[in-house]
């Protein structure tokens, strides 16, 4: 009997020695992965017990996934680990770690259905282990969300919230509630989102004793609340929540704030973090940029974009997480529209090319698949602003066909309507306006986009010389824009209304409209309105025989025109201008002036698209 014990002890010593040696080689500088794998492989020659064998296969899979490109061998080891550990009792960490890693591996090889099947089985087996059950539910719901299977993701998160509640894990329950609210927001289930946010908000206020976890949850809650209001175009309503969010993130980023490891490391059921604080910091910048864009504060949007992009570059140097690329693309999408509003279209096309580069560089083209429609939309806006209307039309049509996002589709259709209006295609215009009207009658869309819809109808009526009808639509637009401080929509509506009054000979009302339009336009700044308004002012001053002011208005008009012409020349000479011809497949790689980070502030100004909308369409999940 003592001989058996001696042999077992000797084997144990061998296992420990080989594992120690493997870890030594793995953590060497630089790591010696070949020798690490050889040490782990040597363990199998001793015919170890099932649990040791399963754990070693898991470790082999982990090392191969982390340090090599040998996906097939990693899969073989993980599948071995799973087949051995699945029936074993009291072996949860190896069993479920293996399932989680195998699911990740299936995703890397674009086998989403295999990943879901693996995790569903693991979720079923983990019901007596709250930590793993919740972790696997979160992982599975994330995959369903990425595949746009939002109802399934939502159901899994509801199960997670119940499991956390049964285990008395309040912090974890709130994480599930907020994650579910995020999914419902993407689904546009407005009432359900409000109910969940209210429920989560009350728990955060009253039932989270740890002040650091409370502040962290508050940031998550406020990010969702701000995004909820912005998705509805409620720029004014959101201000108190945004201010609170900015204060909360400053608290979390303070030097005396404990690290995430300290806050979330004490209790296994509190080891769940939505985003680390450094990424939350970037996200708060991002929603602030979105708010500034919608409110019509282009300078602010540019300033915060530059800060966010600089922060992203710093984080990428530490660890290049995929979510940083998502943030970067969304920020670039926003800043592109800032440039076009201000008139710097040549810089806009450079930034579109930069967004394309980020998308192409992401693994498995995942980012390109998610943002292709937005890129087409941005190129459509650029083409439109440089008077390449045929290209713009095709870009918007590709966007409409590719996207499942209702707001992006509406935005592209409204810009298509403006193209049809400018190119005098009455039948196409009527068809698109009727379709937009039908689609949005029974749904609660963004205030900004619906205001834009009324604006386009007002523009259409103006072009038909139906001035009374134009006034009716534009007053509706102004009512919506003023209610939520949508400054760009207000200035566009005022300048068009001024033109309507000028056309019917009411110079007094025309002046009453164009004056605030120009004041707002210079604050934004929006050369589209400034160019239009200066032409109206020139005519009004001529009619009133005010030669001095007429001369000033004319000089301003010439200045804006010359800026546009100079920028147009730069655009057509840019290598990136070739992107206007991208209609399918991967975008072409263009070599031209590259983008320097942080982004430089625009110096020239122009835009021809009548309405703009932030490019974040619920894709922050």
Curated annotation (Swiss-Prot):
TPR repeats, residue ranges: 96-129, 451-484, 491-524
Domain of life: Eukaryota
Chief location bin: nucleus
Transmembrane spans: none
Gene Ontology CC terms, in alphabetical order: chromatin; nucleoplasm; nucleus; SMC loading complex
Record's subcellular location: Nucleus, Nucleoplasm
Family matches, as SUPFAM superfamilies: TPR-like (SSF48452)
Keywords: Cell cycle, Cell division, Chromosome partition, Mitosis, Nucleus, Repeat, TPR repeat
Alphabetical GO biological process terms: cell division; chromosome segregation; maintenance of mitotic sister chromatid cohesion
Family matches, as Pfam families: Cohesin_load
Keyword Cell cycle: yes
Function: Required for association of the cohesin complex with chromatin during interphase. Plays a role in sister chromatid cohesion and normal progression through prometaphase.
PANTHER family registered for this protein in UniProt: MAU2 CHROMATID COHESION FACTOR HOMOLOG
Annotated family: Belongs to the SCC4/mau-2 family.
Quaternary structure, from the entry: Interacts with Nipped-B to form the cohesin loading complex.
Protein name: MAU2 chromatid cohesion factor homolog
Native organism taxonomy: Eukaryota, Metazoa, Ecdysozoa, Arthropoda, Hexapoda
